Amino acid sequence: QQEQENLEKQSENKKDTLTTDYYKIYYLDGRVESVDTSLNIYKDYKFNFLRQDSFEFLEMPNVGSSYNKLGYTFNNRIDYPKLGFRGKHFHYYEAEDIGYYEVPTPFTEIFAKSSFEQGQILDAVISINLSQELNFTLAHKGYKSLGKYVNTRTRGNQFRFSTNFNSKNKKSKLKFHITSQNMFNQESGGLSPDGIYFFEQAPNYFVLDNFGNQIENEDGSFEMIEYDGYLDRSRLPSRLLAESSLYSKRVFADFNRSLIYNNEKETSILSLGLQFKHEYKKLEYNDPYTSALFGEVEEGILVSDQSRYILQKNVIYLVSDFNKFGKLKVDYSLINSNNTYKDYDGNLSGLIFNLENKQSNFSSKWIKDFSFFKIELNINKSLKEEMVSNYTSITFKTDKIKNIEIKLNALSAEKSPNLNHVFFRSAYKNYNWYNSNLENQKSSSLSAELSFKELIKISGEYSIIDNYIFFRESTNALNGEIDNFRKVDVNQINSQINYFKIKLFSKVDFGKFSFINTGQ
């Protein structure tokens, strides 16, 4: 009887034991992650506003602001040129960033952290499976921070709701999400010339009495205040007292139905899918004091630039999975975009304020597992000449052989400029352009990665870029006084750019301690 009771207890323990492997997160690109509840140095790398390793990013003086990038990669694949305004999108949740959960018990994750000067960040995720087939996930990120300097306050709310559904017979799948994001920033434009002087020099000040006279000490010297600009940054004057914001809503759905299903292996051999995305963005820039930093403003206009962007994408795709031939996905997409700027009630005459584009894409993805390695091929072809995004990418990855793993990738891509490179409208006279003659940017990239256990990982990338497009400050900015005025132009380099970077990661264990280094 005692032995039977022990067996029953062991059976109950096995039944009730759940590891983190049961808590899964699915992404659109096919990635599957398990919830990680461990405490390690990698978690500390991600314990920041972005919730990711910010190794290549240089932070601004406040959270929720933009970042300076210290490294670039040119092997990204996109199916449609972006809106632009990339400084506003570092912490923006794209459709590919949304996770679809599958959890055996209710799951909660809460991230909380204080920030600069009376600031807080809270990011909470609550996920629950109402049944084995249906999951609902609610997530919200809210933040506010005053910042160290004048007029650098930030605040934002980023709401995400996702649903993951798999039918009981596993022949139908649905991924659905809704996002609502609102990000607000005060824009200081950096320190004014006086602010820079006080910041660098930190001069001392004489103390004056009520009549404006200097106060004399007993030794004959005058009483002074020692001022340290580094410790009192909130008093340093800035160039601007402006505000900017990005507001966005998105609805996304991906439905997949198996046409031929292998019941023995519980895998789909042939399936048909439909995907829909509707995204709306509203960008605003308000300068009630009409700063002269960006030049002259149209007469009688209060600076309140506004932009509206609508993107709608419809995709139909077919997926086949045969052991001998690998997994093949073929899709056809229709994309419509509309970008509209405020016309200030017709005061900006002779300019267009609306740009509408349509594009059709044909793309394919092939994955094949061999004995010791895997090959992945991605191709995308735009069928129209405007708003082009063409690429061909091939990836070769080996299995771990004697703890050594190798990954190689080659990419050739061509894409049209971002929309704000082509088209922009503002109350500032110098910030209105329509560049219809920009060439498509072309790039060829080769990357490699070699890793041995967790001891060392070396990765490198070599890229050749033609017709690179970027924003550059004009050398003859307005009156030539670079310190007082800013004029930015869209620039395209006709010559070729060669870009190379190499990154080294190493981890050495000493008992329960680890020594980790990353260099680039």
Say what each PLM segment does.
Residues 1-4, 326:
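Bacterial Sec-dependent N-terminal signal peptides
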Residues 101-150, 154-159, 169-172:
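Outer-membrane beta-barrel translocator/receptor signature
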Residues 78, 103-105, 246-289, 303-520:
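Exposed, low-structure sequence patches enriched in small/polar residues
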Residues 3-104:
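Acidic, small-polar-rich N-terminal luminal/periplasmic segments of exported/outer-membrane proteins
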Residues 54-58, 146-158, 162-247, 397-455, ...:
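Outer-membrane beta-barrel translocator/channel fold
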Residues 169-301, 308-336:
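Outer-membrane beta-barrel domain signature, strongest for Gram-negative TonB-dependent receptors
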Residues 115, 131, 139-145, 179-181, ...:
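An acidic- and aromatic-residue-enriched active-site/binding cleft used to recognize and process polar
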Residues 94, 121-124, 238-239, 302, ...:
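Short structured motifs
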